[in-house]
């Protein structure tokens, strides 16, 4: 994992080197306009990227990972 958001970077696209199989990266949190259930909201979002070795995994696993992160952060925003 790499996090350059604290340095003001919006997004980073990491490069993996064998034997690495993936690298998740997070950019800086920012207020963005989002549509939720047909309504417009201003929400704090973070851009995340996940370069991966497709010989070891596939896009489906990456999508499941991001869905989990999305659910965890939504729950934290509601309860926090």
From Swiss-Prot:
Induction (record text): A member of the dormancy regulon. Induced in response to reduced oxygen tension (hypoxia) and low levels of nitric oxide (NO).
Stored Gene3D superfamilies: Chloramphenicol acetyltransferase-like domain (3.30.559.10)
InterPro entries: 2-oxoacid_DH_actylTfrase, CAT-like_dom_sf
MF annotations from Gene Ontology: acyltransferase activity
Annotated family: Belongs to the 2-oxoacid dehydrogenase family.
Protein name, as recorded: Uncharacterized protein MT1774.1
């Amino acid at each position: 994992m790499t996090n350059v958001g604290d340095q003001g970077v919006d997004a980073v696209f990491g490069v993996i080197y064998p034997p690495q199989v993936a690298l998740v990266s997070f950019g800086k949190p920012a207020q963005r306009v989002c549509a939720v259930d047909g309504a417009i909201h201003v929400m704090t979002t973070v851009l995340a990227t996940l370069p991966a070795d497709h010989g070891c995994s596939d896009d489906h696993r990456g999508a499941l990972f991001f869905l989990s992160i999305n659910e965890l952060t939504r729950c934290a925003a509601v309860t926090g």
